[in-house]
């Protein structure tokens, strides 16, 4: 059994992408490999086969390994629900919400969960490919660390350090990070990978030579800047779009402070007939064919922000002019009469009026609903698959016109009597080509092109493995992975 860890000099250095690439590259070599991230902080999560939730990056990495996502792949998930606090999820299940100080004291317990998951995976797979979090050199976070070197020291594994040259200062990032580590941690770093390089590699070579001489550690390769790679972002919203047809559907997503699972919109971003715009604070909602209210980790707080920004008025105007509106998960809850949080699960206990566009109310309960589901959209009876991650129980007359009939016999969500508003708890409803096409036709797009989002994701994972083969020292990587 071998464990290899990828750490980064900064957030968004390329850790998730590199782990995904290495997982598929190893799989091509006939090696059974499994992804692992000790601790993740993200509002994008995926439902696992064992009924829990993990970070979506680990779900993509599982796909790279051709494995079903499992809670052991990300034993600790932190989902921020305020500027200073987060919901703590252990082995896929919400334990409690804590502020940063309380979680610091809780880390020893969290580490036990991390090590238990790693032990199970390492007993089943010959290679465990680990992703760190942020940077290992955050001085204020090093005590009790479970996400980076604290984990590497505990399981005695080698580390690859990756840095993003596109940001500038790559040599300072690498050398500075190394200098801030302890001697034993420095010894764990077996090499560097430089990510997102553009230009002539010959011009970079003197710097690479200096880095190897300065640190005594090898540069394992330089990965190029790739502009059209479309894998799900771990947390930041990806606003890139490809070339669009002239006849497009204009779709607006208001970005709320605690937006969650915004990867729901990746298929729309890639669709050639959709002009997807994320609207932030201070921006008015422009004329559009479709507005989508996304998921939220703090529904009442985000409702207050929506009103403060005047977006409730803009949504009402949009509907008066015949536009379509979708609410997903937290967005579904916002569309109703009221949202009640008697236990204070997402902030101070209390109730808030919803937008009042659909006749139902939601009560947030401690037991979270986590399941992968399939069924048929009420629109065209198109097949749909997705997943539920929500603490709300929603009841009211509007649910008598459901948006989805689920294969397990339940119904989900609602469609307004005038057909303008659709609400659903299902994340991922745009990923299926037929369900996506049905929703786009409902929103007003004629002659919809069907795209195979799963095939696009698989194509990009294969491209990442190709980059490993072409640009990294695969012989050295095989040694680090214990592969002959």
From Swiss-Prot:
Top-rank lineage group of the source organism: Bacteria
Q: What residues form the membrane-spanning segments?
A: none
Catalytic residue list: 329, 427
Keyword Amino-acid biosynthesis present in the record's keywords: the answer is no
Protein purpose: Catalyzes amidations at positions B, D, E, and G on adenosylcobyrinic A,C-diamide. NH(2) groups are provided by glutamine, and one molecule of ATP is hydrogenolyzed for each amidation.
Q: Which family does it belong to?
A: Belongs to the CobB/CobQ family. CobQ subfamily.
Task: List, alphabetically, the NCBIfam families matched.
Answer: cobQ (TIGR00313), PRK00784.1 (NF001989)
Recorded hits in HAMAP family, A to Z, give: CobQ
Full protein name: Cobyric acid synthase
What organism is the protein native to?
A: Pseudomonas putida (strain W619)
The gene behind this protein is cobQ
């Amino acid at each position: 059994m071998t464990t290899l860890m990828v750490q980064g000099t900064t957030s968004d250095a390329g850790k998730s992408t590199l782990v995904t690439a290495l997982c598929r590259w190893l799989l091509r070599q006939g090696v059974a490999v499994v992804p692992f991230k000790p601790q993740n902080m993200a509002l994008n999560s995926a439902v696992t086969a064992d009924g829990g939730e993990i970070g979506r990056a680990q779900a993509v990495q599982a796909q790279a390994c051709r494995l079903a996502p499992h809670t052991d792949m990300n034993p600790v998930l932190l989902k921020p629900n305020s500027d200073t606090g987060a919901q703590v999820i252990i082995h896929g299940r919400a334990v409690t919400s804590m502020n940063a100080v309380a979680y610091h004291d809780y880390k020893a317990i969290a580490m036990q969960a991390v090590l238990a998951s790693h032990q199970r995976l390492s007993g089943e797979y010959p290679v465990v490919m680990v992703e760190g979090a942020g940077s290992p050199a955050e001085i204020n976070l090093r005590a009790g660390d479970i996400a980076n070197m604290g984990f590497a020291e505990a399981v005695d594994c080698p580390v690859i350090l990756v840095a993003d040259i596109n940001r500038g200062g790559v040599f300072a990032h690498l050398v500075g990070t190394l200098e801030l580590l302890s001697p034993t941690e420095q010894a764990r770093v077996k090499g560097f990978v430089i990510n997102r390089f553009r230009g002539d590699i010959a011009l970079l070579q003197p710097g690479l030579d200096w880095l190897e001489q300065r640190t005594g550690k090898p540069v394992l390769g330089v990965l190029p800047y790739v502009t059209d790679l479309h894998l799900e972002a771990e947390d930041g919203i990806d606003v890139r779009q490809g070339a669009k047809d002239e006849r497009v559907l204009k779709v607006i997503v208001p970005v709320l402070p605690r937006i969650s699972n915004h990867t729901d919109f990746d298929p729309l971003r890639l669709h050639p007939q959709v002009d997807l715009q994320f609207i932030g604070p201070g921006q008015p909602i422009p004329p559009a064919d479709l507005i989508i209210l996304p998921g939220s980790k703090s529904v009442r707080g985000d409702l207050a922000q929506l009103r403060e920004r005047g977006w409730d008025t803009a949504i009402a105007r949009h509907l008066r002019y015949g536009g379509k509106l979708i609410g997903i998960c937290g967005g579904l809850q916002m569309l109703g009469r009221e949202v009640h949080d008697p236990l204070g699960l997402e902030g101070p206990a209390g109730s808030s009026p919803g937008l009042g566009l659909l006749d139902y109310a939601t009560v947030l309960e401690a037991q979270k609903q986590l399941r992968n589901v399939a069924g048929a959209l009420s629109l065209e009876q198109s097949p749909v698959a997705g997943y539920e991650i929500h603490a709300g129980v929603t009841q009211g007359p509007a649910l008598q016109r459901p948006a989805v009939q689920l294969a397990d016999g339940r119904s989900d969500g609602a469609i307004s009597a005038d057909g303008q508003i659709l609400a659903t708890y299902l994340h991922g409803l745009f990923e299926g080509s037929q369900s996506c096409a049905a929703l786009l036709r409902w929103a007003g797009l004629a002659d919809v092109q069907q795209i195979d989002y799963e095939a696009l994701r698989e194509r990009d994972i294969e491209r990442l493995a190709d980059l490993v083969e072409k640009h990294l020292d695969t012989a050295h990587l095989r040694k680090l992975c214990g592969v002959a």
